[in-house]
UniProtKB/Swiss-Prot annotation:
GO MF: serine-type endopeptidase inhibitor activity
Disulfide bond residue pairs: 33-70, 43-66, 47-62, 51-92, 72-86
Family the UniProt entry places it in: Belongs to the serine protease inhibitor-like (TIL domain-containing) family.
Propeptide residue span(s): 25-30
Taxonomic lineage of the native organism: Eukaryota, Metazoa, Ecdysozoa, Arthropoda, Chelicerata
UniProt region (Protease binding loop), positions on chain: 63-65
Keyword annotations: Disulfide bond, Protease inhibitor, Secreted, Serine protease inhibitor, Signal
Protein name: Venom peptide SjAPI
Subcellular location: Secreted
Source species: Scorpiops jendeki
GO cellular component term of the entry, any: extracellular region
Tissue specificity of this protein: Expressed by the venom gland.
Span of domain TIL: 33-92
Presence of keyword Glycosyltransferase: no
InterPro entries listed in its UniProt record: Ser_inhib-like_sf, SerProtInhib-TIL_Domain, TIL_dom
Length: 94
């Protein structure tokens, strides 16, 4: 599936969430995450902490928009250099 189509689907799901429709109608298979350190959230951060930004002392602005999908579980951050998997901060790629 193309990235544009995925973004469209997630945008629609976020819109439904804003309307307070909930995601009960989404098939369970769409709510499964591929990594053991991820979990599905209806309203995750659109600017999650990653290995690239977790040591950055400068605050960044982030839109207050829900991200619908798989996010890293608490205590884990995304490492884009390892295939975008969720790792403990001390295990980030150098």
């Amino acid at each position: 599936m193309k990235w544009g189509a995925l973004l469209c689907i997630f945008g629609f799901l976020a819109f439904c969430s804003v309307l307070d429709r909930g995601l009960g109608w989404i098939p369970d298979i769409w709510q499964k995450c591929s990594s053991k350190n991820e979990e599905f959230q209806q309203c995750g951060s659109s600017c999650p902490e990653t290995c690239a930004n977790h040591k950055n002392p400068e605050p960044k602005s982030c839109a207050a928009v829900c991200f619908v999908g798989c996010v890293c579980k608490p205590g884990f951050i995304r490492d884009d250099l390892k295939g975008s998997i969720c790792v403990k901060p001390e295990d980030c790629s150098k």
